[in-house]
Swiss-Prot record:
Transmembrane segments: none annotated. Keywords: Methyltransferase, S-adenosyl-L-methionine, Transferase. Exhibits S-adenosyl-L-methionine-dependent methyltransferase activity. GO terms for biological process: methylation. This is Putative S-adenosyl-L-methionine-dependent methyltransferase MAP_3564. It comes from Mycolicibacterium paratuberculosis (strain ATCC BAA-968 / K-10). The keyword S-adenosyl-L-methionine applies. S-adenosyl-L-methionine binds at residues 135, 164-165.
Length: 313
């Protein structure tokens, strides 16, 4: 279970689960400024610096922050390097997923819990593509307003679906123009770990009901960290943050649901009308040259996510 969550909690970009979108955007911004980036997100830095989510996430934009952390704690620095590399690899993986989907003729996209995802703006979508973004109303409003005020326009027909995924989001999606008879490419990135196990099953059940043959779904699975190890890392990060002077406004780990009976996403999809495959995130990081050898828990497969892709039979 999660100690900071309730069944009806809500958030904006500066609180609770909303702040995790800022964290991920900060990692994308850092990767974008690398000499040979895996991904390019020209809007990530803007979305971070205007969020007001706290100095911790903005500090991640500092190119010298890793060296400062390393001077205090090498293991925490390795984790920071890993987190940045992981987010770059994850983004690259799902960017490729969408490129493959539109190459196959799919023109209807749904990004679940989209947060500060800027794919509707930064990817080169074919004419006639509609991108639906589902998230909390205040999160969607912050992103669209910030980008519009800075002259950024979508590269597809972007439609906001301001609804909590614990509510009747299929009805809200249809009301926004979604056509359940058309093939769709769905994405659940950075989402499943913030859902209880039964809500994860329900989410994929509803996706299946809205997906004709040839539709696709991609997901990042929820990692499973041992409680003792999680607490050790929490204490180390707090010590480093205190030394550097960062205020920790939220404990991301406490926002996640740890359910030992959570279904394996690949197995569940294969048993419910999909053809699913997965690449373990550590394999993807090695393949793309972003693996950090001394990262904590490197020998624990369950501590890292899978990237799953499936097609509706």
């Amino acid at each position: 279970m999660s100690s900071l969550r309730t069944h009806d909690d809500t958030w904006d970009i500066k609180s609770s689960v909303g702040t995790t979108a800022v964290m991920v955007a900060a990692a994308r911004a850092v990767e974008t400024e690398q000499p040979d980036p895996l991904i390019r997100d020209p809007y990530a830095k803007l979305l971070v610096t205007n969020s007001g989510a706290g100095v911790l996430w903005e500090a991640m934009l500092d190119p010298d922050i890793a060296a400062r952390v390393e001077a205090l704690d090498e293991e925490s620095a390795a984790h920071l390097h890993h987190m940045r590399g992981y987010q770059a690899v994850r983004t690259h993986f799902f960017d490729t997923y969408f490129a493959d989907a539109v190459a196959a003729g799919i023109r209807q996209i749904v990004i679940l819990a989209s947060g500060l995802d800027s794919r509707a703006y930064r990817l080169d979508w074919p004419a006639g593509t509609t991108v639906y973004e589902i998230d909390q109303p205040q999160v969607l409003a912050y992103k669209s307003t910030t980008l519009a005020e800075n002259g950024v326009t979508p590269s597809a027909d972007r439609r906001e679906v301001a609804v909590d995924l614990r509510q009747d989001w299929p009805a809200a999606l249809r009301a926004a123009g979604f056509d359940p008879t058309q093939r769709t490419a769905w994405l659940a990135e950075g989402l499943l770990m913030y859902l209880p196990a039964e809500a994860q099953d329900r989410l994929f059940t509803l996706i299946g009901e809205l997906s004709p043959a040839g539709s696709r779904v991609a997901a990042e699975t929820a990692p499973n960290h041992a409680d003792e190890r999680r607490q050790q890392m929490r204490e180390r990060f707090k010590k480093v943050a205190d030394e550097i002077g960062f205020e920790q406004t939220v404990d991301v780990g406490e926002l996640m649901y740890r359910d030992d009976h959570r279904a394996d996403v690949t197995e569940w999809l294969n048993a419910h009308g999909w053809r699913a495959t997965a690449e373990h995130s550590t394999a993807a990081m090695r393949r793309l040259g972003r693996w950090i050898e001394n990262v904590p828990l490197a020998d624990d497969k369950d501590a890292f996510s899978d990237f799953v892709v499936a097609e509706r039979r």
